[in-house]
Amino acid sequence: MNHPDFPPIGDPQLKLEALTHRSYCNEHPGTPSYDRLEFLGDAVLGFVVGRILFERYPHFTEAELTRLRSQLVNQNQLAYLARFLHIAPEIRLSQSLARDDGQSSPSILADVFESLLGAALLDRGLTAVEDFIQELFVPILEQWEKSQDGRSPKLVPTMDVKSMLQQWALAKTKQLPEYELINTSGPPHAQEFTFTVKVAGKIHGQGSGPSKQIATKQAALEALKSLGLLQ
């Protein structure tokens, strides 16, 4: 899935603030962190996504709308989007947190996604932020709708975990993940497949499912969790 570009933030100081983790501020006293902008971004994201869902699904109950919104904007989903928008390299962290690969932390990535939304709101206005959120989340909903019965939100909108793992592996090791079928069980009409996934020769995840596609996705998901990229 292609993602739109983040609204450009013309004020360089505002953008720097949106990218600054509080650990960086401990080493650079007087530097503002992204916490206040994250608060603002969280509020506008919840509002805009809530309105999208309200208008798109008039037959959903309040509880269903609330559940779907929480699935769309949870930490893992926002961290996934932040990675594909290439936000991580710009985040300012303390030296120790940077050495520990803090830019890959799902919580930090999700926080910075929201803080940049807050900065964009102040710099570009509500319309630009609304347009960006629409462009970002409506395709996710359209993909999700294809697997639904049109009556209730039964499934979480899924992230492309295999693409996420591939991007991480290429960035860190310059190698593609390797999936290996290690077991097939069950009768021909109800088979169960089990795959492992390796990165740079090391097994990081294993998954099973009724199809090879589902099994490899599960393996990728487990690998992302073991690497600390998802929680």
UniProtKB/Swiss-Prot annotation:
Q: Where is the RNase III domain?
A: 1-125
Pfam family name, one = dsrm
Binding, Mg(2+): E38, D111, E114
Q: Which GO terms describe its molecular function?
A: double-stranded RNA binding; metal ion binding; ribonuclease III activity; rRNA binding
The UniProt entry annotates the active site at D42, E114
Key words of the record: Cytoplasm, Endonuclease, Hydrolase, Magnesium, Metal-binding, mRNA processing, Nuclease, RNA-binding, rRNA processing, rRNA-binding, tRNA processing
User: Can you supply a Gene Ontology BP term from the record?
Assistant: regulation of gene expression
InterPro entries xref list: dsRBD_dom (IPR014720), RNase_III (IPR011907), RNase_III_dom (IPR000999), RNase_III_sf (IPR036389)
Question: Out of the domains of life, which is the source?
Answer: Bacteria
* Major place of residence: cytoplasm
**Which cofactors does this protein require?**
Mg(2+)
Q: What class of enzyme is it?
A: hydrolase
Q: Does the keyword rRNA processing apply?
A: yes
Where is the protein situated, by its record's location annotation? Cytoplasm
Which Enzyme Commission number(s) are listed? Answer: 3.1.26.3
Q: Which residues form the DRBM domain?
A: 160-229
Its UniProt entry gives the catalysed reaction(s) as: Endonucleolytic cleavage to 5'-phosphomonoester
Subunit text:
Homodimer.
> Record's family?
Belongs to the ribonuclease III family.
Purpose of the protein: Digests double-stranded RNA. Involved in the processing of primary rRNA transcript to yield the immediate precursors to the large and small rRNAs (23S and 16S). Processes some mRNAs, and tRNAs when they are encoded in the rRNA operon. Processes pre-crRNA and tracrRNA of type II CRISPR loci if present in the organism.
This chain belongs to the protein called Ribonuclease 3 1
- Provenance organism: Synechocystis sp. (strain ATCC 27184 / PCC 6803 / Kazusa)
Its gene?
rnc1
